[in-house]
């Protein structure tokens, strides 16, 4: 999980310095199942809209390797921080319990070895 508000993030100190009141609702994470597992999660959520624009009032999900960065070579994707397993979430104003249940439902459909 990549999130600047986590102490384990390499951007934690910068986030605390520049965003002391809290960071954004944008989170990225990878799935062990790689490209197919990540694409399936992005495609099958119900409460998250499959859109590339982030920071909206509605919750968004994107699998960059199959959408916004698909025209790049694998090396170019890696250089830009996009891995095949990467999911990017932008959390909006929907009820957090609905969002969590949506993600949990999709993740539970994946084989156990494909989870984070």
Predicted regions and their residues:
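Functionally constrained cores in energy, signaling, and assembly domains
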Residues: 2, 42-45, 57, 93, ...
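PLP-dependent enzyme catalytic core of the Aspartate aminotransferase-like
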Residues: 59-116
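Electropositive phosphate-/nucleotide-binding environments in soluble metabolic enzymes
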Residues: 32-35, 51, 93, 97-100
């Amino acid at each position: 999980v990549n999130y600047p508000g986590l102490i384990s993030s390499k951007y934690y100190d910068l986030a605390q310095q520049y965003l002391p009141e809290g960071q954004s609702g944008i989170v990225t994470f990878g799935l062990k199942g790689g490209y197919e597992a990540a694409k399936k999660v992005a495609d099958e959520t119900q409460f998250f809209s499959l859109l590339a624009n982030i920071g909206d009032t509605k919750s968004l999900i994107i699998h960059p390797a199959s959408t916004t960065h698909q025209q790049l070579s694998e090396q170019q994707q890696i250089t830009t921080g996009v891995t095949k397993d990467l999911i990017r979430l932008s959390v909006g104003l929907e009820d957090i319990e609905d969002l969590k249940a949506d993600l949990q439902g999709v993740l539970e459909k994946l084989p156990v070895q494909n989870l984070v």
